[in-house]
């Protein structure tokens, strides 16, 4: 694929795969984040083929409390010893230097502590978004600058471009593989980060990535995608929260939407909006969590239709395709990574908040999750959901 091409349905932009174009000086040294998975393995190989000087790095972010047998499991997350060995194997095959760098302190402060705090506030966080914001495209980027690297690169499924109308404004676009697109968890990348980041596999289908890995003979070619949050190795959030913040796990009442007590919950952080399973209730019809009342330490449940809301308020905004929002704007929004995009109008509220009104009510709008706004294939920006509104 050429360094730049036209891309997108509603915004004229030039897509950069290598960033060796658009009047930019050719830059050669890249700090490549290698998780030990197939995507970052192929990303590193593509950069080597394109002539970059690639330095492979695995970020050690979390190994506390993870049993040795889990760390040695090749199907465990990116912090496992098996993942490090897989990344080292790929780097050796490519003939590039490889290091393991310790980011545990930064990760604990900005991801683990945030994860726990949000749950104790009755919210449902997305730790991958926090990790991208504060670790991969902040602390890791700073490390790259210290090593005199021009770029960082990852195996994320997304693309980077420049707006043809506003030279110098970097854009974040959807990947070629819609099922693997990761723009939702990348929406808070700054212009500085986008200008110094490469996503080498963003223009490929996942099947193409696996085929390339097999062609290169990588041990990661058939490795399954990581599903769990890296620091919750067994995917049991409840266990993790009980161990890390036992004082926040306080039983309380389950109320219906009329305010009647119909059961007892085991601790507010163990529940999320839209949840049906694990409520321990016997009711004539299925009920779902429709709200978490922190002040009363109560879980509010109702029927499925009561989980729908017509809008939301979001704050902590990061705009990418535009410098800011000063007037109402039509766009599409996504309230969860796997949720479909929904038509909406966004209205500014001061400098760092918006009100979002959906054309059709959306199910399980969840405080703490991100809402990301799209203009065709490109990310306008996004923020954190504060509350749902009718």
Curated annotation (Swiss-Prot):
Compartment(s) where it occurs, according to its Swiss-Prot or TrEMBL record: Cytoplasm
Q: Which InterPro entries match?
A: MnmA-like (IPR004506), MnmA-like_C (IPR046885), MnmA-like_central (IPR046884), MnmA-like_central_sf (IPR023382), Rhodanese-like_dom (IPR001763), Rossmann-like_a/b/a_fold (IPR014729)
Per its record, how is this protein called by name? tRNA-specific 2-thiouridylase MnmA
* GO biological processes: tRNA wobble position uridine thiolation
Top-level taxon: Bacteria
Q: Which cysteines are joined by disulfide bonds?
A: 131-230
- Site positions for Interaction with tRNA, renumbered to this chain? 156, 369
Which catalytic residues are annotated?
Answer: 131, 230
Molecular function per GO: ATP binding; tRNA binding; tRNA-uridine 2-sulfurtransferase activity
Alphabetized, the UniProt keywords read: ATP-binding, Cytoplasm, Disulfide bond, Nucleotide-binding, RNA-binding, Transferase, tRNA processing, tRNA-binding
GO CC annotation terms, alphabetical: cytoplasm
Which residues lie within the region annotated Interaction with tRNA?
Answer: 180-182
Which residues does the record give as ATP binding sites?
A: 33-40, 59, 155
Kind of enzyme, top EC level?
Answer: transferase
The record ties this protein, via HAMAP family, to: tRNA_thiouridyl_MnmA (MF_00144)
Q: Which organism is it from?
A: Symbiobacterium thermophilum (strain DSM 24528 / JCM 14929 / IAM 14863 / T)
The function of this protein is: Catalyzes the 2-thiolation of uridine at the wobble position (U34) of tRNA, leading to the formation of s(2)U34.
Q: Kindly list the organism's lineage.
A: Bacteria, Bacillati, Bacillota, Clostridia, Eubacteriales
Q: Which family does it belong to?
A: Belongs to the MnmA/TRMU family.
Q: Cross-referenced CDD domains, in alphabetical order?
A: MnmA_TRMU-like
